[in-house]
Amino acid sequence: MARSKIALIGAGQIGGTLAHLAGLKELGDVVLFDIVDGVPQGKALDIAESAPVDGFDAKYSGASDYSAIAGADVVIVTAGVPRKPGMSRDDLIGINLKVMEAVGAGIKEHAPDAFVICITNPLDAMVWALQKFSGLPTNKVVGMAGVLDSARFRHFLAEEFGVSVEDVTAFVLGGHGDDMVPLTRYSTVAGVPLTDLVKLGWTTQEKLDAMVERTRKGGGEIVNLLKTGSAFYAPAASAIAMAESYLRDKKRVLPCAAYLDGQYGIDGLYVGVPVVIGENGVERVLEVTFNDDEKAMFEKSVNSVKGLIEACKSVNDKLA
């Protein structure tokens, strides 16, 4: 049986980490693509030479021509400019929209049957634009956001409670920006809701609120520390979890930027919601009920996404 083919568009920090993780998890053969000739080829060779040590069998290649991604089962898009200190995700729109147009055309021509995961920021706008430019079905194009944001929240919670991250579940919905919505009511430690843990004295509401705020600013915290780039280990791990659920038909429930056509009262936008990812891509959207505060936060987040979409339309009239 032929191995799956994974195409990685963008061979920067996230792209290289994705390529390595795909090999370690034996998800399939990997093609690294980048417009800077030599970089994808060099990283592909470097990772391939680690395979005998780590004991995984996967073919690696690097390319600067979109024809190399032909027939890919999964395409993960990281191409674009990362955030620098002082930049918001939204500052990247003008630059990265042009990148999405080129990437969308490449996918449309060479990998129209792929499951596409977008990581490029500002995420909710870029995944929307990528779907438009590629013309792929909306259930086969998804954005990596909530898995990462939820992982950050889980890490902070596990540290606070002194428990294993495996026993912490966390839910972060909405847009992948400062208005994201970490839902404490749906987040648990070994099944016990965070709201109950406050009552039990495990933490205080103030500490919980601080962790929520730190989660919202999680990407910016790393940007400010690195000074020359943005996060790449956790974003790559998050996208690989999504790819694995698709390739192995695991049907995991993962918070992702998914296309909504009526769910949550939203039509025609990509917004972070819990979805089931299986062999057909996004197979179901899980609609959770909000209390009044959560509903207000979610609507604020959705309005931020709408603003990004309008900005995209004003920059590129093909999207209008």
From Swiss-Prot:
Gene3D superfamilies assigned: Lactate dehydrogenase/glycoside hydrolase, family 4, C-terminal, NAD(P)-binding Rossmann-like Domain
Keywords of the record: NAD, Oxidoreductase, Tricarboxylic acid cycle
InterPro entries: L-lactate/malate_DH, Lactate/malate_DH_C, Lactate/malate_DH_N, Lactate_DH/Glyco_Ohase_4_C, Malate_DH_type3, NAD(P)-bd_dom_sf
Pfam families per the UniProt record, alphabetical: Ldh_1_C, Ldh_1_N
Record-listed NAD(+) binding positions: 10-15, 34, 96, 119-121
Reaction catalysis annotation: (S)-malate + NAD(+) = oxaloacetate + NADH + H(+)
EC number: 1.1.1.37
Binding site for substrate: 83, 89, 121, 152
Active site feature: 176 (proton acceptor)
MF (Gene Ontology): L-lactate dehydrogenase activity; L-malate dehydrogenase (NAD+) activity
Enzyme class: oxidoreductase
Presence of the UniProt keyword Disulfide bond in the record: no
Any one Gene Ontology BP term: lactate metabolic process
Membership in a protein family: Belongs to the LDH/MDH superfamily. MDH type 3 family.
PANTHER family hit by this protein: L-2-HYDROXYCARBOXYLATE DEHYDROGENASE (NAD(P)(+)), L-LACTATE DEHYDROGENASE
Function: Catalyzes the reversible oxidation of malate to oxaloacetate.
Name the record gives this protein: Malate dehydrogenase
Organism, as annotated: Methylorubrum extorquens (strain ATCC 14718 / DSM 1338 / JCM 2805 / NCIMB 9133 / AM1) (Methylobacterium extorquens)
Lineage: Bacteria, Pseudomonadati, Pseudomonadota, Alphaproteobacteria, Hyphomicrobiales
Gene: mdh
